[in-house]
Amino acid sequence: KCCMRPICTCPCCIGP
């Protein structure tokens, strides 16, 4: 999953 990567730009990672 994108959120599990060292560099994440997904909404779930950069969200509140």
From Swiss-Prot:
Transmembrane segments: none
Tissues showing expression: Expressed by the venom duct.
GO CC annotations, alphabetized: extracellular region
A GO MF term: toxin activity
Location, primary (coarse class): secreted
Disulfide bonds: C2-C13, C3-C10, C8-C12
Alphabetically ordered keywords of this record: Amidation, Disulfide bond, Hydroxylation, Secreted, Toxin
Localization of this protein: Secreted
Positions where 4-hydroxyproline occurs in the chain: P11
Modification(s) after translation: Reg12e and reg3e are conotoxins with identical sequences, but different post-translational modifications. Reg12e is C-terminally amidated, while reg3e is not.
Modified-residue entries (Proline amide), positions: P16
Family per similarity comment: Belongs to the conotoxin M superfamily.
Record text about domains: The cysteine framework is III (CC-C-C-CC).
Protein name listed in UniProt: Conotoxin Reg12e
Organism listed in the record: Conus regius
Lineage of origin: Eukaryota, Metazoa, Spiralia, Lophotrochozoa, Mollusca
